[in-house]
A protein has these predicted regions:
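Anionic-ligand binding region
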Residues: 70-114
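A C-terminal functional module that forms or caps the active site or interfaces directly
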Residues: 105-159, 164-166
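Short acidic active-site motifs
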Residues: 1, 58-59, 78-81, 99-100, ...
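Intrinsically disordered or low-complexity boundary/linker segments at protein termini
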Residues: 39-57, 104, 170-192
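Short, flexible loop segments at boundaries between secondary-structure elements
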Residues: 99-100, 162-173
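Glycine/small-residue-rich loop that forms an oxyanion/phosphate-binding "nest" at active or ligand-binding sites
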Residues: 2-59
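Structural motif
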Residues: 9-10, 69, 136-137
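Active-site glycine-rich loop that binds ribose-phosphate moieties when present
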Residues: 51-65, 73-77, 121-123
């Protein structure tokens, strides 16, 4: 990745808030290439009434004591945490790629329960999925507006489902205005 950065004067890491491994790779590549880096933080999804947990494992532990079907809108990497739950209750929404489908198979998810689609999803589509599969619990990450968090929140309310939100990893960075100012300041210095 460092080779890709050579010739660039700056880099902005605007990856998903949960893409810690990718962000670490970007930091290492920028350090190796000598390219200044800023982390752009997404605005959080806002307040909601629901359950907030720190990890997929904590969500699974909580849901093991609850009744009802569960929509797992967390990606395929989080599925192993839910392997101790009755798989007929689990409805993972994953990308329609072999890697995600294989993760579902490894987790013992019945094929009829796999929802393989590209997002982000509208409020109406989220609500339709919640109603179609009689979802009582929707497990999601707080991807902010870009990740469709508001649509998930509204759809859960519409369908009478409860949200279980996996909190963001701790990270440092800047908001959009600060990152833009940093980029513009560097551009102005180049022109002088």
């Amino acid at each position: 990745m460092a080779a890709l950065l050579r010739g660039f004067s700056q880099c902005v890491d605007a990856t998903h808030p949960y893409a810690a491994e990718v962000s670490a790779n970007i930091r290492a590549a920028c350090a190796e290439a000598g390219v200044p880096l800023r982390r752009l933080l997404r605005d959080p999804g806002g307040s909601f009434t629901g359950i907030r947990v720190d990890s997929p494992e904590e969500a699974a532990s909580f849901l093991a004591k609850q009744m009802g079907n569960i929509l797992l809108a967390i990606g395929a990497k989080g599925l192993p945490a839910f392997s101790g739950l009755d798989s007929v209750r689990l409805y993972p929404r994953v990308l329609p790629v072999e890697e995600s489908l294989a993760a579902c198979r490894r987790a013992g998810i019945p094929t009829r329960n796999i929802i393989a689609m590209h997002g982000p999803f509208s409020r109406a589509l989220n609500a339709a999925i919640l109603e179609q599969y009689r979802i009582r619990w929707m497990v999601t990450k707080d991807g902010g507006a870009a990740g469709g968090f508001g649509e998930k929140l509204a759809a859960a309310r519409d369908a009478g489902a409860e949200l279980v939100v996996i909190g963001r990893p701790k990270e440092t960075g800047d908001g959009l205005e600060d990152v833009l100012a940093w980029l513009l300041a560097a551009e102005c210095q180049k022109e002088e």
